[in-house]
Regions:
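Small-residue-enriched transmembrane helix starts and helix-helix packing motifs
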Residues: 1-23, 127-142
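Hydrophobic alpha-helical transmembrane segments in multi-pass integral membrane proteins
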Residues: 88-94, 98, 102, 142-149, ...
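Cytoplasmic-side transmembrane-helix entry/capping segments in multi-pass membrane proteins
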Residues: 71-82, 103-108, 127-137, 170-174, ...
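Membrane helix-loop-helix hairpins that form the core translocation module of multi-pass transporters
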Residues: 46-118
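Transmembrane helix exit motif
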Residues: 60-70, 104-128, 213-217, 237-248
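Interfacial loop-to-transmembrane junctions
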Residues: 214-236
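Small-residue-rich hydrophobic segments that form or flank transmembrane alpha-helices
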Residues: 14-74, 141, 151-205
Length: 248
């Protein structure tokens, strides 16, 4: 899956892991949203997704509050929906040409950046409705499973719930960690993985975790709104580059 990588590809991979980890540390989300589209510039979507296997797990598990799981009770309807949706979306992902998936990733990233830049929120009555949470989760899961970009619609939902900064961070990590279960169940069902592939994703942990650690250390020292907006501008550029590569 990762044989014959040239120096440029390795540098792009390192850059994506460092930037994704740092962003996760600073604003509590954004690791796969940042890293995945950059990786798809130099790797097929399936390889890019597996490269992030261990980094995504460890980047999120460290911020989950396992001592008080009742904090996540409010997310149960959304979680059921997104879990089911990912199974459907992942089926589409693994049965569609990689070029089409890459284009879908580019478009999703650009739309996500625009919506978040505008600060879009779901109506307070809707976001508190369990049926809406279930259906919105299902839709989010289908889109996320199909493009492997799980964060965008999930972030909009969590922002709309108006959690405190700490609880928002914990809920993002919990949901991302939970969605990895159906995502990678489907991955291992359809893709052949060898021992060397696990070694590569293990090595990817080093830059990702180090940069997340740095991001966590300066989380309260960087104006988060400014950093978030710069991240969204960068995402738009990356999305356009992905589209440019696969459309022209």
């Amino acid at each position: 899956m990762f044989s014959n990588l040239d120096q440029i590809t390795l540098l792009v991979i390192l850059f994506s892991l460092c930037l994704g980890g740092f962003t996760k540390g600073v604003i509590s989300w954004g690791f796969p949203v940042i890293s995945l589209p950059i990786l798809t510039i130099v790797l097929p979507p399936t390889s890019a997704l597996f490269l992030l296997f261990f980094p995504i797990i460890f980047a999120n598990i460290r911020e989950i509050n396992f001592k008080n799981m009742r904090n996540y009770k409010k997310l149960i309807p959304f979680s059921i929906g997104i879990f089911s949706g990912i199974l459907i979306g992942s089926y589409i992902f693994h049965n569609t040409k990689s070029e089409i998936i890459s284009i879908a990733i580019g478009i999703t990233i650009i739309i996500f950046a625009f919506i978040n830049f505008k600060g879009f929120k779901i109506n307070e009555i809707l976001v508190s409705n369990k049926l809406f949470g279930l259906l919105y989760g299902l839709f989010s899961g289908i889109i996320g499973g199909m493009t492997t970009v799980l964060g965008p619609l999930m972030i909009i939902y969590l922002v709309s719930l108006n959690f405190s900064k700490e609880k928002f961070s914990q809920n993002v990590s919990f949901l991302v960690f939970a969605t990895l279960i159906p995502l990678y169940i489907m991955f291992f069902t359809y893709q052949k993985v060898v021992v060397n592939d696990f070694l590569v994703t293990s090595l990817a942990l080093i830059p990702a975790m180090f940069m997340q650690y740095l991001g966590l250390k300066i989380r309260d020292k960087i104006p988060q709104k400014t950093f978030k907006n710069l991240t969204l501008v960068f995402l738009t550029v990356v999305g356009l580059l992905v589209l440019y590569k696969h459309l022209l």
